[in-house]
Swiss-Prot record:
Myosin is a hexamer of 2 heavy chains and 4 light chains. The keyword Phosphoprotein applies. The gene is MYL11. It comes from Gallus gallus. The lineage of its organism: Eukaryota, Metazoa, Chordata, Craniata, Vertebrata. The N-terminus is blocked. N,N,N-trimethylalanine, found in other myosin light chains would not have been detected in the N-terminal tryptic peptide in PubMed:7358336 because it would remain trimethylated and ninhydrin negative after hydrolysis. One of its GO terms (cellular component) is myosin complex. The modification Phosphoserine is found at S15. Changing F103L: Results in 50% reduction in actin filament velocity. This is Myosin regulatory light chain 11.
Length: 168
């Protein structure tokens, strides 16, 4: 009887994480998982993380950083564990902090900006892809500076508050 209860509890635990998100969100997480799972074995490991960082232009990630990321999970990081980890991190999180955190991943040097070309490539090739019209509208609302950099703090503010910061 005990093994059946344990199996039922494990199934309930995994089904609870899927109830935290709607189907669209789950699909977006699945797409993100697939992008990170570089070797397509269904498990995110240290090599997958290293290759993902390299694809984003960050080539000097230390083993300690990667080990710390992997150790955040209780075991191998399959999709259910991945979704659970995000569910736990997002539960009670301020949406502005979450969005800012996502941008900071793309800005390992902490400059507060990212290259327009890099952001445009991500937005047109990954997950919920932007149309050319959406890209045009975004650059009209958030024009890059003369060096081709985009201030993501302002984008984050507008996403979460619906209007530009006054005085910026």
């Amino acid at each position: 009887m005990a093994p059946k209860k344990a199996k039922r509890r494990a199934a309930e635990g995994s089904s609870n994480v899927f109830s935290m998100f709607d189907q669209t969100q789950i699909q977006e997480f699945k797409e993100a998982f697939t992008v990170i799972d570089q070797n397509r074995d269904g498990i995110i490991d240290k090599d997958d993380l290293r290759e993902t960082f390299a694809a984003m232009g960050r080539l000097n990630v230390k083993n300690e950083e990667l080990d710390a990321m992997i150790k955040e999970a209780s075991g191998p990081i399959n999709f259910t564990v991945f979704l659970t980890m995000f569910g736990e991190k997002l539960k009670g999180a301020d949406p502005e902090d979450v969005i800012m955190g996502a941008f900071k991943v793309l800005d390992p040097d902490g400059k507060g900006s990212i290259k327009k070309s890099f952001l445009e490539e991500l937005l047109t090739t990954q997950c919920d892809r932007f149309t050319p019209e959406e890209i045009k509208n975004m650059w009209a609302a958030f024009p890059p500076d003369v060096a081709g950099n985009v201030d993501y703090k302002n984008i984050c503010y507008v996403i979460t508050h619906g209007e530009d910061k006054e005085g910026e």
